[in-house]
Structures are given as structure tokens and as C-alpha cells.
Amino acid sequence: MNSNVENLPPHIIRRVYKEVSTLTSDPPEGIKIIPNEEDITDVQVNIEGPEGTPYAGGMFRMKLILGKDFPAAPPKGYFLTKIFHPNVSNNGEICVNVLKKDWKAELGIRHVLLTIKCLLIHPNPESALNEEAGRLLLENYEEYASRARLMTDIHAQGTSLRGKDPTDPCSSASTPVVSGDGPMAKKHAGDRDKKLAAKKKTDKKRALRRL
């Protein structure tokens, strides 16, 4: 892989190195940086699939490539782990506004990573690179979620990450993971109700035995 380090001015290299070092020691919730000491323009990370989404329980490897025009031009983002998502093409390319028209030179790598993680919670079918995933998201959410879970189970099994980031715009403290009336929400609510009912039944039997 060709490195862009020699194409970047020294002050940009120092900026990137500092931010990657900070992200490595203090990563956002559900994100782990994998430093590349030989090429800091190749930023690879593991992103934990957010709870309440079809990607929950998965660990997704992705990378940002910082081009020679960075930070005037946005980095390019790719998922290395196969994923069924409207905004990720078959070759892993990520389509999100912050990597295109909404990019600003002052935006950092942390902001980009949090935006990509947020995309797992709130897909945007209007800018779909995977047309089938975008169509299913709009027309048949249950089928979309089933396909996404299957891909997650096959390709994205990994170890859970720990730690919370108060700056994460998609954290449970600031943004609900799914709407209360969505198919996933109903499923989880039903599972919880069944478990509570079973527990109450068991507790009642134990109480009767003591009488």
C-alpha cells in the first residue's frame, strides 16, 4: 500500500500523530484504534456494533485513508469487515456527508469515527451505495434487519469493547438507539416481558412451597 506520509507537510503529520495517540489512549465508546506506526495516514479501527441495532454483538474493522490533500480534503472511509448497510458499498466504501460535502478542515478523526458509528444506528437510505439494503430499510425493515444480523453473525464476531464517551452524539445518554415502536424495539420488549413473567412465576412457586 502506498503511504501518503511523504506527501503531507510536517505540521499536518504532527497533528495526525497527536490525534491518533490521543484516540489510542482515550478512545470513544465502542471504538478501538489500531495504530499503524509505519503509516499514520492509514488509520484502522474496530467499531463495536451498537446495542438495539442489527449490528449488535459484532465487531467491525474499518479504515480511514488520509490523502495528500488532507485536511483540506476529507479522508476516505472503508469497512474491511463485510456488512449489510445502505451506506456501505460492496467493496466497503462508506458514504456519509462528513466524508463529502459536510467536511471541514477543522474536523478531526474522532468526529469522523463517531459519525460512522452513528451511521450504524441511523442509516440514510437516501444516499444508499447498497441499493438493496436501502430499499429493504424503507420497504421491509424486518427483512433488512434479518439480512444485516446474518452478515454480522457470519463476518463480524469479536470481543466487546468497554468505556463510554460523553462526546458521542449517538450514546444512550443523548440519542435513543431505536424508536420505541420499531420492530427491534418490539422484539426486545417482548423478550423482556417473557423473562419477567417467568421470574414472577418461579418466585410465586417458591413462596407457595414455604407456606
From Swiss-Prot:
Pathway: Protein modification; protein ubiquitination. One of its GO terms (biological process) is anaphase-promoting complex-dependent catabolic process. GO terms for molecular function: ATP binding; ubiquitin conjugating enzyme activity. One of its GO terms (cellular component) is anaphase-promoting complex. The keyword Nucleotide-binding applies. The active site is at C95. Residues 158-211 are annotated as: Disordered. CDD domains: UBCc_UBE2S. Its EC number is 2.3.2.23. Catalyzes the covalent attachment of ubiquitin to other proteins. Acts as an essential factor of the anaphase promoting complex/cyclosome (APC/C), a cell cycle-regulated ubiquitin ligase that controls progression through mitosis. Acts by specifically elongating 'Lys-11'-linked polyubiquitin chains initiated by the E2 enzyme ube2c/ubch10 on APC/C substrates, enhancing the degradation of APC/C substrates by the proteasome and promoting mitotic exit. PANTHER family: UBIQUITIN-CONJUGATING ENZYME E2. This is Ubiquitin-conjugating enzyme E2 S-B. It comes from Xenopus laevis (African clawed frog). The gene is ube2s-b.
